[in-house]
């Protein structure tokens, strides 16, 4: 690993020449695409002239969108690999501007399409059978018809989009640019400025004094700005409720979930079922208290790992282990994994200027690339199989669907990645016999479950409560938000709000509350993945085949129908109950290891 990208071996860098062989070819495509988008301006007002025009304009729009995605992928990934290079900052800005131009040019498309009556649409299908392959694409647009206003009204609302988004943007600037946190001490006794970036690592410290100081420094700062954060959050909630109301939805939640055709019962079932199983989280908190040897568990004690042992994997060892684990899906899946690992789909190591974190990206006509910032840890092995899950989902979808259905809903995205993580856990627990290593694996799993199912559902419950409160005329003051959040936190963790005063301000630092009913999908996805992984590892070949069909389906059907074919009914609590059974089994094993004194070895 080197700070300088030029020193990193080529085999550890993604190969973006498979997208565009040279920067010059990218620039040529941008010029040609700009011209093609300009040429499309004449389509406005003519979409429904005939069945032929509907087909031609639809296909031009999809073709330009497809080319634009490829242009954007190249620019954004070139920029992500080293954000200090001005040339690629400019490339990304050009690609973003081109997206805006494309959106503006085709803004007529949906309003005009919605003027088409059902009888005329059926006549068009008879006249032009080639339209049939777009039937589901059109159907999803038509389903939105009761919620689309007149063209003038929609243009008026579109013109106010920056105003509606201002609360979220204000939060981002306040939280990321203006907020300054105190200086605290790390585990080495060194003074460091507290930041969003180092907060979690400080909270994971084995030194309780370090954790407590970081926790109090973080939340006492939010306490000072609680009234401003309450106003930005209230404004965002009011914006969502207003937009839902004028578009004839009963609530902001109904509006948000309808975008993915998700019934509200999925959300309700999640909250109800998680609440039913909260005693399991309380039990895990008690075990955590015992392992840490504390008289009284505080909120600053819930992130530190219970195991000081970290199983180590070099990147090449992680590739080998991942291929072994994912072979369970069969030959076709394994062959694609091998290609991803050997044909330079992955940008592996940290380098100066590289975007932090990890993701899977790409477009319909490119490889499903992955960005990593590799460290030799168990956590990074999980990251590798997670991102490989996303990339294989994209690959299977693109190989089996036309471009129009060649992507998938956010609601389904996390299932493929976390199924891989859960299969890794199942496999490691089958293979690893050493008590200390089993302890580390179980701790990793239980903390992941805590952070994804329990915590994200707590967020989802809070998010819905504040939208309902605003609808009912409640002013979302900081006092109201603090009390609501403190009560929810006490209910979830079983730790009294009196003893954990500062946690009442946590709502102020959560960006997801500006994402409009997004967080619940983390919890539903993780639970579905738990359920599917167990079926794949312990079930029959039909279960694997059903799962691969889900990966292939893309947007060819509604999300709930796609995942139902894999064996999960997400309107029922069964998949959630099954996930909690796995959680309890693993909690019992960890409790037994603690009873044996493994944590003290």
Swiss-Prot record:
CDD domains: M3B_PepF
GO cellular component term of the entry, any: cytoplasm
Main location: cytoplasm
A single MF term (Gene Ontology): metal ion binding
Keyword S-adenosyl-L-methionine applies: no
Gene Ontology biological process terms from the UniProt entry: peptide metabolic process; proteolysis
Enzyme Commission (EC) number: 3.4.24.-
Cofactor comment: Binds 1 zinc ion.
One Pfam family per UniProt: Peptidase_M3
Names of the cofactor(s): Zn(2+)
NCBIfam families the record matches: pepF
PANTHER family linked to this entry: PROTEASE M3 THIMET OLIGOPEPTIDASE-RELATED, SACCHAROLYSIN
Descriptive protein name: Group B oligopeptidase PepB
Organism: Streptococcus agalactiae serotype III (strain NEM316)
Organism ancestry: Bacteria, Bacillati, Bacillota, Bacilli, Lactobacillales
């Amino acid at each position: 690993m080197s700070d300088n990208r030029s020193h990193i071996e080529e085999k550890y860098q993604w190969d973006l020449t498979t997208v565009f062989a040279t920067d010059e070819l990218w620039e040529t495509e941008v010029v040609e695409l700009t011209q093609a988008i300009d040429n499309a301006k004449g389509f406005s007002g003519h979409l429904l002239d005939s069945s032929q025009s509907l087909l031609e304009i639809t296909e031009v729009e999809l073709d330009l969108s497809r080319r634009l995605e490829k242009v954007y992928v190249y620019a954004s990934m070139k920029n992500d690999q080293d954000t200090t290079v001005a040339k690629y900052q400019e490339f990304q800005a050009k690609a973003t501007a081109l997206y805006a131009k494309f959106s503006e040019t085709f803004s007529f498309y949906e309003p005009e399409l919605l003027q088409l009556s059902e009888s005329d649409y059926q006549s068009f299908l008879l006249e032009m059978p080639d339209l049939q392959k777009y039937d589901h694409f059109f159907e999803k647009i038509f389903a939105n018809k009761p919620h689309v206003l007149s063209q003038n009204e929609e243009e008026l609302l579109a013109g106010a989009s920056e105003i509606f988004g201002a609360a979220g943007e204000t939060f981002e600037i306040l939280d990321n640019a203006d907020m300054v946190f105190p200086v605290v001490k790390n585990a080495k006794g060194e003074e460091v400025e507290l930041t969003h970036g180092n907060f979690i690592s400080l909270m994971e410290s084995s030194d309780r004094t370090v954790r407590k100081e970081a926790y109090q420094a973080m939340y006492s700062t939010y306490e000072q700005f609680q009234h401003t954060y309450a106003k930005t959050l209230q404004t965002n909630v009011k914006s969502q409720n207003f937009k839902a109301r004028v578009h004839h939805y009963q609530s902001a939640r109904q509006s948000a979930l309808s975008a993915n055709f998700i019934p509200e019962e999925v959300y309700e079932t999640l909250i109800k079922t998680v609440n039913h199983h909260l005693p399991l989280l309380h039990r895990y908190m008690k075990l955590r208290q015992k392992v840490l040897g504390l008289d009284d568990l505080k909120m600053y004690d819930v992130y530190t790992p219970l195991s000081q042992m970290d199983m180590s994997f070099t990147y090449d060892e992680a590739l080998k282990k991942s291929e072994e684990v994912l072979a369970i899906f069969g030959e076709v899946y394994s062959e694609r994994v091998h290609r991803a690992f050997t044909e330079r789909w992955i940008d592996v190591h940290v380098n100066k200027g590289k975007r932090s974190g990890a993701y899977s990206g790409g477009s319909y006509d490119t490889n499903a690339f992955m960005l990593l910032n590799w460290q030799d840890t168990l956590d990074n092995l999980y990251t590798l199989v997670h991102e490989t899950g996303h990339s294989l989902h994209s690959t299977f979808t693109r190989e089996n669907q036309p471009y129009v259905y060649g992507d998938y809903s956010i609601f389904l995205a996390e299932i493929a990645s976390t199924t891989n993580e859960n299969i890794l856990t199942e496999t490691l627990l089958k293979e690893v016999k050493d008590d200390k290593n089993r302890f580390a694996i179980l701790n990793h799993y239980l903390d992941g479950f805590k952070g994804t199912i329990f915590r994200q559902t707590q967020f989802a419950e809070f998010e819905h409560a504040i939208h309902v409160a605003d609808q009912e005329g409640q002013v979302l003051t900081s006092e109201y938000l603090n009390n609501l959040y403190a009560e929810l936190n006490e209910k979830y963790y079983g730790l009294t709000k009196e003893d954990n005063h500062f946690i009442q301000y946590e709502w102020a630092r959560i960006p997801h509350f500006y994402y409009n009913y997004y967080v619940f999908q983390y919890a539903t996805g993780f639970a579905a993945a738990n359920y599917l992984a167990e079926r794949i590892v312990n079930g029959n070949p039909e279960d694997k085949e059903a799962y691969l069909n889900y990966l292939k389906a893309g947007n060819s059907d509604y999300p709930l129908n796609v995942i139902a074919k894999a064996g999960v009914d997400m309107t029922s609590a069964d998949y959630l109950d099954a996930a909690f059974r796995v959680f309890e089994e693993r909690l019992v094993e960890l409790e037994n290891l603690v009873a044996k004194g493994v944590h003290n070895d």
